[in-house]
């Protein structure tokens, strides 16, 4: 088995494949997230959000998805786009959430697949987790130093905001994790 690709190589591959940010987190259990999800679920504070609260033990422990996992390579893909022009015909128009206008997870997957391929080519295992409740993406992104938790509970990426979809490559390649970013929020 070769040495794992360098962090700078991983970031370069991700960014050249369309990702907007790439960071590394360790594969430890997200203990505080597990406690928060379990507490909210037991108090009925999940408002029927079964996707998020279905299996907190699984979604906060990367090693349940990949037992030999040592590192998470977390990617973010922006879905921000400028406002569309308003209809000039006077016809009714609708509003659709930005993230629902196209398959942004598909673009995220392309970037993460390019990273996974590089790892596999070097002899390492890689598993991609995107939008399937197998991992709490926001906590992975926070731990990977991609952004911080904003007052809206979303991950805020410096100078970019919260208009991102998130996903991870789990791997048995060991990397030094990035440090989480300090809270950059003001008093909005």
Predicted regions and their residues:
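Auxiliary alpha/beta "docking" domains used to position bulky ligands
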Residues: 1-187
